[in-house]
Design a protein with these regions (language model features):
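Conserved serine/cysteine hydrolase catalytic core
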Residues: 207-268, 277
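Conserved alpha/beta-hydrolase catalytic His-Asp/Glu region
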Residues: 170-230
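Conserved HGGG/HGGXW glycine-rich cap/lid loop of the alpha/beta-hydrolase fold
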Residues: 25-80
Length: 309
């Protein structure tokens, strides 16, 4: 059976988690049968839960899956002020709130999985609250060595830009005549050049709203996406060193955001972990190798079961 054609068999439910300052919107699969393994997936900066539908939907036979729209993304309504954004601890705290609700609903610790920024947030949440987390599956998480991070912080402190990713995001066009035009503009180009068209369509579907004038507008404001790239005041090294849960990691051969020494540091935290560089993959590994990512999540769950965790 063709993987890309078989993954749409289950339509996710759209849910809301109310918090004091707004709601976290998330998608949910596999919730109709008790006993499935609880799994939360956190997306990359600028994306949304629906982007990963073709990775996550096939897991619904064995997993109870929740995938959020992070603060400032998708249908989530939590405050997202680019001018006051300094680090990713806000995502850690939001993810802890999601994990607490998921654990309460299922009565079980959950697996946290995430891509890029979502992987980093999952590491920080697991380090802070191992009582909620059974393990981690990381897909090219953003882990920047301290020297490079300090340069970013100094640039931010003195009002300098000097961050090509942030500068590019800030210039991103936010409004198109319709979603179809947006898909045509993105497909096969720029950051989307290695994505199957179906992933671009899902990204646009989950990441836009239709305005009163009929035009399609990005739900993740370019200014917020840019602020995320610049907001490097969190200490991911400290979180890695405080990890006390098992994990697995896939990272890219080309343009990986998981820079040395982090693959080695992570391996020290869990000597049994599978830390695998995927040949031919870029940072957009989930879009390029969706079945591989889904299979890694299944294999990690099997490892936990075999070890009685």
């Amino acid at each position: 059976m063709n993987f890309m054609n078989s993954v749409v068999r289950e339509t996710p439910a759209r849910r809301q988690l109310p918090l004091p300052e707004g709601t976290i919107s998330y998608l949910e699969w596999g919730y109709d049968e008790p006993g499935k393994t609880p799994l939360h997936f956190a997306h990359a900066n600028g994306f949304n839960a629906m982007t990963y539908r073709r990775v996550l939907a096939p897991l619904a036979d064995q997993f109870h899956v929740r995938a959020w729209d992070a603060r400032g993304h998708g249908a989530t309504t939590l405050t997202a002020d680019p001018g006051n954004h300094r680090n990713w601890y806000v995502y850690r705290d939001d993810l802890i709130a999601m994990a607490e609700d998921f654990v309460k609903a299922t009565g079980r610790k959950i697996i946290l999985a995430g891509h890029s920024m979502g992987g980093a947030a999952s590491v920080m949440a697991a380090a802070a609250r191992p009582d909620l987390v059974r393990g981690l599956v990381l897909v090219d998480p953003v882990m920047i060595p301290s020297g490079a991070r300090h340069v970013m912080l100094l640039s931010q402190l003195f009002g300098l830009k000097g961050n090509p990713l942030a500068d590019g995001a800030e210039k991103r066009r936010a409004v198109f005549p319709d979603r179809e035009t947006m898909v045509e503009r993105y497909a096969g180009r720029g950051a989307f050049r290695t994505w199957p068209r179906e992933f671009v369509e899902d990204y646009v579907q989950g990441g836009t709203k239709i305005r009163d004038d009929g035009q399609a507008e990005l739900l993740c404001a370019p200014a917020w996406e840019a602020a995320n790239f610049r907001a490097q005041g969190h200490n991911i090294t400290k979180s890695v060193r405080n990890l006390h849960v098992p994990f697995a990691m896939l990272y890219a051969e080309h343009g990986s955001t998981c820079r040395p020494p982090f693959p080695m540091l992570l391996k020290r935290r869990d000597p049994k972990a599978q830390v695998t560089q995927i040949r031919g993959a870029t940072h957009f590994l989930p879009m390029e190798f969706p079945k591989l990512v889904a299979d890694e999540i299944r294999a990690f769950r099997d490892r936990l079961e075999a070890e009685g965790r």
